[in-house]
């Protein structure tokens, strides 16, 4: 299968320039079209008014009932001679031409090719192409006339109820057409120049408008791993970029948090591994410094075994979290009775709880949930181990289970010193300890609660913690059917 070559999208500057220029040029051409159309309509109305004025004058002469035809035609010729750029033709009731403008073709010969004038508003007005002849122009001397606007109307005394003549009047429109063509050419030239100017102006405006984007880009490029505390000021950018800057600040804040946790994680894991390794080396060096009895060597080996077991557990926990980070932690779900699972965990911690004088209590129904039994037991074990570490002797750790709206809640409560609110959001971070020294003996590796969160998330649930003067409360919420 042949993949299509990657085609980079057009730049924002190109697209903005294209659309703004297109819209502006289109608006200019629309204005030009409206102007040309308005001029055409204006000239058409002006010509029609002239034609009506001429026809009214000639109609008065030809309608005179007491005049002979010869007298009418003589008067007609006197009147027509006073009009320039006008052709007249007069036909009798038999369709025979009885008069037409002297020195000009009979316009009736061209009338059959006349077309209706679309620019004329009202009245039967036609356009003629021809005849062609030289006639006086408007301030231009003589010019060639070949385009006419024509009307025809019945005139003269009535015979059998009908006028005896049909009058044809044609007015030259070449001067108007020349004016319109000249105007169109000028508008086209002007539009071409303006279009080029618009493109350059828009390009310049877009370039200037993108200056804040380039400024933000430069600021972002200057941020390195050593400057993750730097934030962009949203007040210094246009409002269109404010959300982008805020989103970037949120992103860099998350990166800073991850980077800090990663740095702390590297330091913590190095410290956690260094301590048992140092103990192993020290104890081995002491054992080898002189001859030892078998009992002394066994004690050293047992001590080393404890350190190695602790390291193995920590490595196992880290591999578990790595699987969770890469979405490889897939629970093998089956329906479980949480009361039974809590009972198994209680059995495991019962001896330790008795040694510390702490009572373990379970309150609630036999909640059913779809989950991985080993994972859920591990999460409960980590919570109980954490609770035993901080519960004073003579107190009780209570595990509650309840089902609300198809959600199963597992609550682990223990009395003890409350945790400061600023620590609560980070309790589930790896190697995070409330004690700033982070080195309390017997506190564990510091990743137990991180494992709890990974297991709960793998089961599509949530885990939260609250703490006050009455104690600390962890709440796990799991979907009943997974």
From Swiss-Prot:
MF-aspect GO terms: ATP binding; phosphorelay sensor kinase activity
Residues with Phosphohistidine modification: 271
Transmembrane segments: 16-36, 187-207
Keywords carried by this UniProt record: ATP-binding, Cell inner membrane, Cell membrane, Copper, Kinase, Membrane, Nucleotide-binding, Phosphoprotein, Transferase, Transmembrane, Transmembrane helix, Two-component regulatory system
Stretches assigned to the Periplasmic side: 37-186
PROSITE patterns documented for this protein: HAMP, HIS_KIN
Membrane topology: Multi-pass membrane protein
Membrane side Cytoplasmic: residue ranges: 1-15, 208-482
Compartments (UniProt record): Cell inner membrane
Gene3D superfamilies: 1.10.287.130, 6.10.340.10, Histidine kinase-like ATPase, C-terminal domain
GO cellular component, one term: plasma membrane
CDD domains (UniProt xref): HAMP, HisKA
Catalyzed reaction equations: ATP + protein L-histidine = ADP + protein N-phospho-L-histidine
UniProt PTM comment: Autophosphorylated.
EC number: 2.7.13.3
Residue ranges occupied by any Histidine kinase domain in the UniProt entry: 268-482
Pfam family, one: HAMP
Domain HAMP positions: 207-260
InterPro entries on file: CusS-like_sensor (IPR048590), CztS_silS_copS (IPR006290), HAMP_dom (IPR003660), HATPase_C_sf (IPR036890), His_kinase_dom (IPR005467), HisK_dim/P_dom (IPR003661), HisK_dim/P_sf (IPR036097), Sig_transdc_His_kin-like_C (IPR004358)
NCBIfam families according to UniProt: cztS_silS_copS, PRK09835.1
General function of this protein: Member of the two-component regulatory system CusS/CusR involved in response to copper and silver. Acts as a copper/silver ion sensor. Activates CusR by phosphorylation.
Protein name: Sensor histidine kinase CusS
């Amino acid at each position: 299968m042949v993949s299509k070559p990657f085609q980079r999208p057009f730049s924002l500057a190109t697209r903005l320039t294209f659309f703004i220029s297109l819209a502006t040029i289109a608006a200019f051409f629309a204005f030009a079209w409206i102007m040309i159309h308005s001029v055409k309509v204006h000239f058409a109305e002006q010509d029609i008014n002239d034609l009506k004025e001429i026809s009214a004058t000639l109609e008065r002469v030809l309608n005179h009932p007491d005049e002979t035809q010869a007298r009418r035609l003589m008067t007609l010729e006197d009147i027509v001679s006073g009009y320039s750029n006008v052709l007249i033709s007069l036909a009798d009731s038999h369709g025979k031409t009885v008069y037409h403008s002297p020195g000009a073709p009979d316009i009736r010969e061209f009338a059959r090719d006349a077309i209706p004038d679309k620019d004329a508003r009202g009245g039967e007005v036609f356009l003629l192409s021809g005849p062609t002849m030289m006639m006086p122009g408007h301030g231009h001397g003589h010019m060639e006339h070949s385009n006419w606007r024509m009307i025809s109307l019945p005139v003269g005394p009535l015979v059998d109820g009908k006028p005896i003549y049909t009058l044809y009047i044609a007015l030259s429109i070449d001067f108007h057409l020349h004016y319109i063509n000249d105007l169109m050419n000028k508008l086209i030239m002007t539009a071409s120049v303006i279009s080029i100017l618009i493109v350059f102006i828009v390009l310049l405006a877009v370039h200037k408008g993108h200056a804040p984007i380039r400024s933000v880009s430069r600021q972002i490029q200057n941020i390195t791993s050593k400057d993750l505390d730097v934030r962009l000021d949203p007040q210094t950018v246009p409002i269109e970029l404010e959300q982008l800057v805020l989103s970037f600040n949120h992103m860099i804040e998350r990166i800073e948090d991850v980077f800090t946790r990663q740095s702390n994680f590297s330091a913590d894991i190095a410290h956690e591994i260094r301590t048992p390794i140092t103990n192993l080396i020290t104890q081995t060096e002491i054992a080898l410094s002189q001859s030892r009895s078998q009992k002394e060597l066994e004690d050293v080996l047992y001590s080393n075994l404890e350190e190695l077991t602790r390291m193995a557990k920590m490595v196992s926990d880290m591999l578990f979290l790595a699987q969770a980070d890469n979405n490889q932690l897939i629970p093998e779900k089956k329906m479980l009775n949480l009361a039974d699972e809590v009972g198994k965990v209680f059995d495991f911690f019962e001896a330790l709880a008795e040694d510390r004088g702490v009572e373990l209590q379970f309150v609630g129904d036999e909640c059913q949930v779809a989950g991985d039994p080993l994972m859920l037991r591990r999460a409960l074990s980590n919570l109980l181990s954490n609770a035993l570490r901080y519960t004073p002797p003579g107190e009780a750790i209570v595990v509650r289970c309840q089902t609300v709206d198809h959600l199963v809640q597992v609550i682990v409560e223990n009395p003890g010193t409350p945790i400061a609110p600023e620590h609560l959001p980070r309790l589930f971070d790896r190697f995070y300890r409330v004690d700033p020294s982070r080195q309390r003996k017997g506190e564990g590796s510091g990743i137990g609660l991180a494992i709890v969160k990974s297991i709960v998330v793998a089961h599509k649930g949530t885990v939260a913690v609250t703490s006050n003067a009455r104690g600390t409360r962890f709440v796990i919420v799991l979907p009943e059917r997974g």
